[in-house]
Protein backbone atom coordinates (compact mmCIF):
# COMPACT_ATOMS: atom_id res chain seq x y z
CA UNK A 1 0.00 0.00 0.00
CA UNK A 2 1.09 3.59 -0.39
CA UNK A 3 2.61 5.38 2.55
CA UNK A 4 0.61 8.51 3.26
CA UNK A 5 2.07 11.36 5.27
CA UNK A 6 -1.27 12.75 6.38
CA UNK A 7 -2.69 12.58 9.89
CA UNK A 8 -4.13 9.21 10.87
CA UNK A 9 -6.95 8.65 13.31
CA UNK A 10 -5.08 8.78 16.59
CA UNK A 11 -1.42 9.68 16.25
CA UNK A 12 -0.78 13.00 14.48
CA UNK A 13 2.23 13.89 12.40
CA UNK A 14 3.76 16.86 14.17
CA UNK A 15 6.61 18.18 12.08
CA UNK A 16 5.33 21.70 12.75
CA UNK A 17 5.02 21.06 16.47
CA UNK A 18 3.70 23.74 18.79
CA UNK A 19 4.83 22.06 21.99
CA UNK A 20 6.74 25.01 23.35
CA UNK A 21 6.53 26.70 26.71
CA UNK A 22 3.06 28.16 26.70
CA UNK A 23 2.81 27.36 23.01
CA UNK A 24 -0.59 25.74 22.56
CA UNK A 25 -2.61 27.66 19.99
CA UNK A 26 -5.74 29.36 21.29
CA UNK A 27 -9.03 29.18 19.39
CA UNK A 28 -12.37 30.91 19.91
CA UNK A 29 -14.43 29.26 22.69
CA UNK A 30 -17.00 27.90 20.21
CA UNK A 31 -14.44 26.73 17.63
CA UNK A 32 -14.60 23.08 18.70
CA UNK A 33 -17.48 20.92 19.94
CA UNK A 34 -17.50 20.14 23.68
CA UNK A 35 -14.64 17.91 24.81
CA UNK A 36 -15.43 14.29 25.66
CA UNK A 37 -15.76 13.58 29.39
CA UNK A 38 -12.80 12.21 31.37
CA UNK A 39 -12.34 8.44 31.30
CA UNK A 40 -11.10 5.78 33.70
CA UNK A 41 -8.86 2.77 33.12
CA UNK A 42 -7.69 0.04 35.48
CA UNK A 43 -4.34 -1.72 35.81
CA UNK A 44 -4.12 -4.88 37.91
CA UNK A 45 -0.74 -5.62 39.40
CA UNK A 46 0.59 -9.16 39.59
CA UNK A 47 -0.32 -9.38 43.29
CA UNK A 48 -3.92 -8.43 42.52
CA UNK A 49 -3.72 -4.80 43.63
CA UNK A 50 -5.74 -2.48 41.40
CA UNK A 51 -4.57 0.92 40.20
CA UNK A 52 -7.33 3.24 39.01
CA UNK A 53 -6.21 5.60 36.27
CA UNK A 54 -8.12 8.77 35.50
CA UNK A 55 -7.48 10.36 32.10
CA UNK A 56 -8.49 13.73 30.70
CA UNK A 57 -11.40 13.61 28.26
CA UNK A 58 -9.31 14.90 25.37
CA UNK A 59 -5.87 16.41 24.93
CA UNK A 60 -4.03 17.67 21.85
CA UNK A 61 -0.99 16.16 23.57
CA UNK A 62 -2.56 12.67 23.50
CA UNK A 63 -2.79 12.56 27.31
CA UNK A 64 -6.30 11.09 27.09
CA UNK A 65 -4.96 7.65 26.07
CA UNK A 66 -3.47 4.82 28.15
CA UNK A 67 -0.71 3.83 25.75
CA UNK A 68 0.64 0.30 25.32
CA UNK A 69 4.15 1.47 26.13
CA UNK A 70 3.06 2.58 29.60
CA UNK A 71 1.43 -0.79 30.30
CA UNK A 72 4.35 -2.85 29.00
CA UNK A 73 7.06 -0.97 30.92
CA UNK A 74 4.91 -1.18 34.07
CA UNK A 75 4.72 -4.95 33.65
CA UNK A 76 8.48 -5.04 33.08
CA UNK A 77 9.11 -3.17 36.33
CA UNK A 78 6.92 -5.65 38.18
CA UNK A 79 9.03 -8.48 36.77
CA UNK A 80 12.27 -6.60 37.54
CA UNK A 81 11.54 -4.48 40.64
CA UNK A 82 15.26 -3.95 41.22
CA UNK A 83 15.19 -1.50 38.30
CA UNK A 84 13.23 1.01 40.39
CA UNK A 85 13.39 -0.05 44.05
CA UNK A 86 15.29 2.49 46.18
CA UNK A 87 16.04 4.54 43.05
CA UNK A 88 15.01 8.01 41.90
CA UNK A 89 12.67 8.01 38.90
CA UNK A 90 11.54 10.68 36.43
CA UNK A 91 8.79 10.09 33.88
CA UNK A 92 8.15 12.60 31.11
CA UNK A 93 5.08 12.79 28.88
CA UNK A 94 3.37 10.63 31.47
CA UNK A 95 -0.37 11.32 30.89
CA UNK A 96 -2.00 9.11 33.57
CA UNK A 97 1.43 8.21 34.95
CA UNK A 98 0.97 4.43 35.24
CA UNK A 99 4.69 3.48 35.14
CA UNK A 100 5.44 6.10 37.80
CA UNK A 101 2.68 4.80 40.05
CA UNK A 102 3.96 1.24 39.67
CA UNK A 103 7.53 2.36 40.39
CA UNK A 104 6.37 4.14 43.54
CA UNK A 105 4.41 1.08 44.71
CA UNK A 106 7.49 -1.09 44.09
CA UNK A 107 9.51 1.03 46.49
CA UNK A 108 11.23 3.72 44.44
CA UNK A 109 13.05 6.25 46.62
CA UNK A 110 11.45 9.21 44.84
CA UNK A 111 9.31 9.44 41.70
CA UNK A 112 8.63 12.63 39.77
CA UNK A 113 5.85 12.15 37.22
CA UNK A 114 5.53 14.92 34.63
CA UNK A 115 3.64 16.01 31.56
CA UNK A 116 3.00 19.30 29.77
CA UNK A 117 2.08 21.97 32.36
CA UNK A 118 -1.59 22.00 31.47
CA UNK A 119 -3.64 22.28 34.70
CA UNK A 120 -6.06 19.52 33.72
CA UNK A 121 -3.27 17.05 32.97
CA UNK A 122 -1.31 17.86 36.14
CA UNK A 123 -4.50 17.62 38.21
CA UNK A 124 -5.21 14.17 36.77
CA UNK A 125 -1.71 12.97 37.66
CA UNK A 126 -2.21 14.15 41.23
CA UNK A 127 -5.66 12.54 41.33
CA UNK A 128 -4.13 9.21 40.33
CA UNK A 129 -1.42 9.54 42.97
CA UNK A 130 -3.79 10.44 45.78
CA UNK A 131 -6.33 7.84 44.71
CA UNK A 132 -3.88 4.94 44.80
CA UNK A 133 -4.47 3.06 48.08
CA UNK A 134 -0.99 1.49 47.98
CA UNK A 135 0.50 5.00 48.11
CA UNK A 136 -1.62 6.37 50.96
CA UNK A 137 0.28 8.52 53.48
CA UNK A 138 -0.64 10.52 56.55
CA UNK A 139 1.24 13.59 55.35
CA UNK A 140 1.77 14.86 51.80
CA UNK A 141 5.46 15.45 52.49
CA UNK A 142 5.89 11.73 53.20
CA UNK A 143 4.94 10.72 49.66
CA UNK A 144 7.59 9.07 47.51
CA UNK A 145 5.88 10.40 44.36
CA UNK A 146 4.98 13.89 43.16
CA UNK A 147 3.47 15.31 39.97
CA UNK A 148 4.71 18.37 38.13
CA UNK A 149 4.45 20.14 34.78
CA UNK A 150 7.43 20.00 32.46
CA UNK A 151 8.11 21.03 28.86
CA UNK A 152 10.55 18.69 27.11
CA UNK A 153 14.00 20.22 26.83
CA UNK A 154 13.23 22.76 29.55
CA UNK A 155 15.37 23.68 32.54
CA UNK A 156 16.08 20.74 34.79
CA UNK A 157 16.45 22.63 38.08
CA UNK A 158 12.74 22.45 39.07
CA UNK A 159 12.78 18.68 38.49
CA UNK A 160 16.00 18.10 40.40
CA UNK A 161 14.67 20.23 43.26
CA UNK A 162 12.24 17.41 44.08
CA UNK A 163 15.24 15.24 44.98
CA UNK A 164 16.61 17.62 47.59
CA UNK A 165 20.32 18.23 48.00
CA UNK A 166 22.54 15.83 46.05
CA UNK A 167 26.26 15.15 46.20
CA UNK A 168 28.46 17.03 43.77
CA UNK A 169 28.73 15.10 40.51
CA UNK A 170 25.72 12.93 41.35
CA UNK A 171 22.88 15.26 40.40
CA UNK A 172 20.10 13.65 38.41
CA UNK A 173 17.74 10.71 38.38
CA UNK A 174 18.71 7.05 38.38
CA UNK A 175 15.86 6.11 36.05
CA UNK A 176 14.00 7.99 33.31
CA UNK A 177 10.82 6.71 31.66
CA UNK A 178 9.74 7.71 28.14
CA UNK A 179 6.69 5.68 27.14
CA UNK A 180 5.24 6.11 23.63
CA UNK A 181 6.70 9.54 22.92
CA UNK A 182 8.75 8.88 19.79
CA UNK A 183 5.91 9.54 17.32
CA UNK A 184 6.52 13.25 17.92
CA UNK A 185 9.52 13.39 15.59
CA UNK A 186 10.07 17.13 15.84
CA UNK A 187 10.56 16.76 19.60
CA UNK A 188 13.33 14.13 19.46
CA UNK A 189 16.11 16.64 20.06
CA UNK A 190 14.32 18.02 23.12
CA UNK A 191 13.75 14.52 24.48
CA UNK A 192 17.46 13.78 24.19
CA UNK A 193 18.18 17.16 25.79
CA UNK A 194 16.04 16.13 28.75
CA UNK A 195 17.94 12.86 29.11
CA UNK A 196 21.23 14.78 29.03
CA UNK A 197 20.01 17.29 31.62
CA UNK A 198 18.40 14.87 34.08
CA UNK A 199 20.00 11.39 33.87
CA UNK A 200 22.52 10.88 36.64
CA UNK A 201 26.06 10.41 35.30
CA UNK A 202 26.63 7.22 37.21
CA UNK A 203 26.90 3.51 36.26
CA UNK A 204 23.50 1.86 36.32
CA UNK A 205 21.54 5.01 35.49
CA UNK A 206 19.41 4.59 32.40
CA UNK A 207 16.46 5.93 30.46
CA UNK A 208 13.83 3.37 29.51
CA UNK A 209 12.36 4.25 26.11
CA UNK A 210 9.37 2.09 25.18
CA UNK A 211 7.25 2.61 22.09
CA UNK A 212 5.17 1.26 19.22
CA UNK A 213 5.39 2.56 15.66
CA UNK A 214 1.70 3.40 15.42
CA UNK A 215 2.31 4.73 11.89
CA UNK A 216 4.35 1.89 10.36
CA UNK A 217 5.26 3.91 7.27
CA UNK A 218 7.09 6.34 9.56
CA UNK A 219 8.90 3.73 11.66
CA UNK A 220 12.27 4.92 10.35
CA UNK A 221 11.52 8.37 11.79
CA UNK A 222 10.64 6.86 15.17
CA UNK A 223 13.92 4.94 15.22
CA UNK A 224 15.88 8.07 14.26
CA UNK A 225 15.58 9.07 17.92
CA UNK A 226 18.16 6.45 18.82
CA UNK A 227 20.55 7.65 16.11
CA UNK A 228 20.35 11.11 17.65
CA UNK A 229 20.98 9.70 21.13
CA UNK A 230 24.08 7.88 19.85
CA UNK A 231 25.30 11.07 18.18
CA UNK A 232 25.03 12.79 21.57
CA UNK A 233 27.30 10.14 23.11
CA UNK A 234 24.79 7.74 24.66
CA UNK A 235 24.85 3.94 24.52
CA UNK A 236 21.60 2.45 23.21
CA UNK A 237 20.56 -1.16 23.88
CA UNK A 238 17.35 -3.00 23.03
CA UNK A 239 16.04 -4.97 26.00
CA UNK A 240 12.45 -5.87 25.20
CA UNK A 241 10.03 -6.79 22.41
CA UNK A 242 6.40 -7.71 23.10
CA UNK A 243 3.59 -8.47 20.69
CA UNK A 244 0.17 -7.39 21.95
CA UNK A 245 -2.98 -9.34 21.13
CA UNK A 246 -4.32 -6.53 18.96
CA UNK A 247 -3.29 -2.99 17.95
CA UNK A 248 -4.17 -0.18 20.31
CA UNK A 249 -6.06 1.54 17.49
CA UNK A 250 -7.57 -1.33 15.53
CA UNK A 251 -8.99 0.70 12.63
CA UNK A 252 -5.86 2.71 11.89
CA UNK A 253 -3.94 2.07 8.65
CA UNK A 254 -0.59 0.36 8.28
CA UNK A 255 0.98 -3.04 8.91
CA UNK A 256 -0.93 -4.61 11.81
CA UNK A 257 2.02 -6.65 13.07
CA UNK A 258 4.11 -3.51 13.47
CA UNK A 259 1.23 -1.73 15.22
CA UNK A 260 0.99 -4.65 17.68
CA UNK A 261 4.71 -4.63 18.50
CA UNK A 262 6.09 -2.81 21.54
CA UNK A 263 9.86 -2.50 21.84
CA UNK A 264 11.92 -1.28 24.77
CA UNK A 265 15.34 0.34 24.70
CA UNK A 266 17.74 1.71 27.30
CA UNK A 267 19.70 4.91 26.78
CA UNK A 268 22.64 5.34 29.15
CA UNK A 269 25.95 7.09 29.59
CA UNK A 270 29.00 5.15 28.34
CA UNK A 271 31.34 3.51 30.84
CA UNK A 272 34.98 4.58 31.03
CA UNK A 273 35.94 1.45 29.08
CA UNK A 274 33.39 2.25 26.38
CA UNK A 275 34.69 5.81 26.15
CA UNK A 276 38.23 4.52 25.78
CA UNK A 277 37.20 2.01 23.12
CA UNK A 278 35.33 4.68 21.16
CA UNK A 279 38.34 6.98 21.35
CA UNK A 280 40.63 4.19 20.13
CA UNK A 281 38.33 3.49 17.18
CA UNK A 282 38.12 7.15 16.17
Swiss-Prot record:
It is an enzyme of class 2 (transferase). One of its GO terms (cellular component) is cytoplasm. It comes from the Eukaryota. Its main location: cytoplasm. The keyword Cell wall biogenesis/degradation does not apply. Its EC number is 2.1.1.-. Residues 1-13 have a biased composition (Basic and acidic residues). Residues 1-32 are annotated as: Disordered. Keywords: Cytoplasm, Methyltransferase, S-adenosyl-L-methionine, Transferase. InterPro entries: EFM7, Methyltransf_16, SAM-dependent_MTases_sf. S-adenosyl-L-methionine-dependent protein methyltransferase that trimethylates the N-terminal glycine 'Gly-2' of elongation factor 1-alpha, before also catalyzing the mono- and dimethylation of 'Lys-3'. PANTHER family: HEPATOCELLULAR CARCINOMA-ASSOCIATED ANTIGEN, PROTEIN N-TERMINAL AND LYSINE N-METHYLTRANSFERASE EFM7. This is Protein N-terminal and lysine N-methyltransferase efm7. It comes from Neurospora crassa (strain ATCC 24698 / 74-OR23-1A / CBS 708.71 / DSM 1257 / FGSC 987). The gene is nnt-1.
Amino acid sequence: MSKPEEVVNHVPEDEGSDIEAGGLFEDPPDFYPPSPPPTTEHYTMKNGDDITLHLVGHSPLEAHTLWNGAVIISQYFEEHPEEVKDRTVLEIGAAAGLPSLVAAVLGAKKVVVTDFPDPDIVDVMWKNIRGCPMLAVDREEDRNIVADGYVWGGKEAPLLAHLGEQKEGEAGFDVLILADLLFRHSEHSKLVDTIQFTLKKKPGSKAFVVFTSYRPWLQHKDLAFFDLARERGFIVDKFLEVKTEKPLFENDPGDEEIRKTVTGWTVRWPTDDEKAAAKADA
